[in-house]
A protein has these predicted regions:
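Short amphipathic coiled-coil heptad-repeat segments
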Residues: 142-149, 276-279, 297-307
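Proline-centered turn/helix-capping motifs that create local helix->coil transitions or kinks
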Residues: 137, 303-315
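Non-transmembrane amphipathic alpha-helical segments
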Residues: 98-109, 125, 266, 270-280, ...
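ABC ATPase nucleotide-binding domains
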Residues: 259-280, 284-299, 318, 531-536
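Short low-complexity stretches enriched in small and charged residues
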Residues: 21-28, 290-293, 315
Length: 536
C-alpha cells in the first residue's frame, strides 16, 4: 500500500521560535493514525512538510505510494472556483498538469480555431489527457458528484463552489480521495463541516479503507471509531500512543506522571551535585589534597547539566472566554413565512432572549444562509424577518476566509476594530492562548487559532445575539470546552448551526432543516435528516 516515516523533524517560525523539534513517528501500511494536539502546535505545518509544501529545517520525511492531500481549508466561497477545480485540486499531479495544458489548448482553439499548429497542440493535449488518466478521473468524479451532490459530473463540473455548503465541498473532496488511486492520504480536519450522517460515513470509510491514512482531528467520536494509533504534538515534541483513543487520556496522564517523576528525580540529583561541588570547593581552599575531588565533581556536574533535564510535562491550555451579552427585547428574532429562495420552504419561528437554539440539518440545506441573513448578509429570500430591540448580532462564519484581515497582525486588527493599545491587546490575546501570535498575520494562524481570534472579536464587540456557524469545528478540546463554558455564562441569545453532538447537549431547543424542504422545531436534536432533494 504505502507508508509515511518522519524522523527528527524540526521547524522554526520566522520570529525565531521553535514550533516543534525532534518529531519522529511512522505510519505503517494500511494504518489509520490520528495526529492530535493543541491549536497552533504545528499539526498542519507537519502535514504540509509530509506533503512537500514546506521544507523542514532539519530531519527527514520518507513516503511510499501515491500521496493524496486534503488541506484544512478546502474549496472556496469568495471566488469563481468550480466543482471541477476542487476535484482537480485533490487529483494526482500528473492529472492536474494535463488538465492545465488541455485548458490552455482549448482557450487557444477558441481564439485561433483555424490555425493548424493550434489544432495540433489541442489534439496532443487531448491525447496527453487520456494517457495520464484524465478520462479515468472523470469517471471517478462522476461517481463522486452523484454520491456527494446527487447529480452527475457532466452537470456539476462547472457549478460554482460558492453555491455549495462547506460540508458538501468537504464530502466531495473526501469521496475523490477515498475512491482515488493514491495509496497514502493526508487529511487535515476531514470531519469539519460534515453533517452527522457524513461524519458516520467518514468513520466507516476510514475503518474499511485499505489505504494508509494520517489525519488531523479534534472530533472525539471520529478519533474513537477510526484511529488505530494516536500521534500527539504538544510543547514542540511528539509522542505516540499505540492504542486507540479510548485509552488515550489514561495513557497521557500516566506519561505526564512519569515525566513529573523523572523531573523530580533530576532536580534532586542536580541539587545534590551542586551541594557536593560547593562542599568540595570549600574543603579544597584549605586542603590541596581535595582539589582533584573538587575538579572531578565539577566535571560530573557539568556533564549532568549538559545532558539536560528530562522532557517537561506539557502545559495544559487555559483559554478564558468572557462573552458578556446584554439585555434585549423579549423577542430576539422573529421570522414570518420566510423562504430561503431555492433552499427551504416557508417557515415561521420566534427566538426569545436568552435562548440557546441549535440549527440542525444536512449539508446544503440552507442553515448557513439562514444565519448569514440574520447577520445582515445578502441572501435571496421572501417573507419577513426582524431582530428585536437592542439586538446586536455577532456572526461567526463557517469558513475562515477573511480578505479584510489578510496581511494584518492580530495586534493591528484589535487596534483597528476596538482601539486596544498593544498592552491591552496582548492581555486579551493571552486569555485566548494567542499571546505569542500577536504580531503574526491573521492568515498564518492555524484554523483553531483563527477561530479563537474570531470569538475574541465577538466578545469585544459586545454582541447581544451570537450567530455561530460550526464554531467548534477547528477548536481543540480545551478551546471547545472553554467556548461551552463561555456560552453557559453568556447573557444573551445564541443561535448555533452545529453538527457537534457534544455542543448540542448544551442547547435548549432545535430548528431542523428537513430533507423534504420543511423547517420544524424539536426539543431534542435530530441527526438523521438526509440530503435535501431539489433541482440543481
Amino acid at each position: 500500500v504505502g507508508h509515511v516515516e518522519v524522523t527528527k523533524l524540526r521547524h522554526q517560525l520566522p520570529d525565531g521560535r521553535v514550533l516543534f523539534a525532534d518529531v519522529s513517528f511512522r505510519v505503517a501500511d494500511g494504518a489509520k493514525v490520528a495526529l492530535v494536539g493543541p491549536n497552533g502546535a504545528g499539526k498542519t505545518t507537519l502535514v504540509r512538510m509530509i506533503a512537500g509544501d514546506l521544507v523542514p529545517k532539519s530531519g527527514t520525511v520518507t513516503t511510499s505510494g501515491g500521496l493524496g492531500v486534503m488541506r484544512q481549508f478546502i474549496g472556496s466561497v469568495r471566488d469563481d472556483s468550480t466543482v471541477r477545480d476542487l476535484l482537480l485540486g485533490v487529483a494526482p499531479p500528473r492529472v492536474q498538469q494535463a488538465a492545465a495544458a488541455l485548458d490552455a489548448a482549448e482557450l487557444a482553439m477558441m481564439e485561433h480555431d483555424d490555425d493548424e499548429p493550434t489544432q495540433m497542440r489541442y489534439a496532443q493535449a487531448l491525447a496527453d489527457w487520456g494517457d495520464t488518466g484524465g478520462y479515468d478521473a472523470e469517471v471517478l468524479w462522476d461517481t463522486c458528484t452523484v454520491a456527494a451532490l446527487g447529480v452527475p459530473y457532466e452537470r456539476a463540473q462547472y457549478r460554482g463552489l460558492r453555491t455549495l455548503s462547506g460540508g458538501e465541498q468537504k464530502r466531495l473532496a473526501l469521496e475523490a480521495l477515498l475512491r482515488g488511486p493514491d495509496e497514502v492520504l493526508l487529511l487535515d480536519e476531514p470531519d469539519n463541516y460534515l453533517d452527522v450522517p457524513g461524519k458516520l460515513w467518514l468513520e466507516n470509510e476510514l475503518r474499511e479503507s485499505v489505504k494508509t491514512v494520517l489525519f488531523i482531528s479534534h472530533d472525539r467520536e471520529l478519533l474513537s471509531r477510526a484511529a488505530t494509533r494516536i500521534v500527539t504534538i504538544e510543547d514542540g515534541r511528539s509522542w505516540v500512543h499505540g492504542g486507540s483513543f479510548a485509552t488515550y487520556h489514561e495513557a497521557r496522564n500516566e506519561r505526564n506522571e512519569r515525566l513529573e517523576e523523572l523531573r523530580r528525580r533530576w532536580d534532586e540529583e542536580h541539587a545534590k551535585l551542586k551541594a557536593l561541588v560547593l562542599r568540595l570547593k570549600i574543603k579544597a581552599t584549605y586542603n590541596d589534597g581535595m582539589a582533584s575531588q573538587y575538579h572531578a565533581a565539577q566535571t560530573r556536574l557539568r556533564r549532568f547539566e549538559e545532558a539536560g533535564p528530562p522532557e517537561e510535562t506539557p502545559r495544559d491550555q487555559k483559554v478564558r472566554m468572557r462573552l458578556q451579552g446584554g439585555r434585549t427585547g423579549v423577542r430576539a428574532v422573529t421570522v414570518d413565512n420566510l423562504e430561503l429562495t431555492g433552499l427551504m420552504r416557508p417557515f415561521s419561528v420566534e427566538i426569545f432572549f436568552g435562548e440557546r437554539v441549535g440549527v440542525l440539518g444536512s449539508n446544503g440545506s440552507g442553515k448557513s444562509h439562514f444565519l448569514r441573513l440574520l447577520a445582515g448578509g445578502e441572501v435571496a429570500h421572501t417573507g419577513r424577518w426582524k431582530l428585536g430591540a437592542r439586538v446586536v448580532p455577532g456572526h461567526f462564519a463557517q469558513t475562515h476566509e477573511h480578505p479584510e484581515m489578510v496581511g494584518r497582525s492580530l495586534v493591528e486588527l484589535l487596534w483597528a476594530e476596538h482601539s486596544l493599545q498593544r498592552h491591552d491587546a496582548m492581555r486579551a490575546l493571552a486569555r485566548y492562548e494567542l499571546q505569542f501570535c500577536g504580531d503574526q498575520p491573521f492568515e498564518t494562524l492555524s484554523g483553531g487559532q483563527q477561530a479563537r481570534f474570531q470569538i475574541l472579536l465577538l466578545e469585544l464587540a459586545g454582541s447581544t445575539a451570537l450567530l455561530l456557524d460550526e464554531p467548534t469545528d477547528n477548536l481543540d478540546l480545551a478551546s471547545a470546552e472553554a467556548l461551552e463554558e463561555g456560552l453557559a455564562g453568556y447573557q444573551g441569545t445564541v443561535v448555533a448551526v452545529t453538527h457537534d453532538r457534544w455542543l448540542a447537549r448544551s442547547l435548549d431547543r432545535f430548528l431542523i432543516f428537513g430533507a423534504d424542504g420543511s423547517v420544524y422545531e424539536t426539543p431534542e436534536p435530530v441527526w438523521d435528516e438526509g440530503r435535501v432533494v431539489r433541482e440543481r
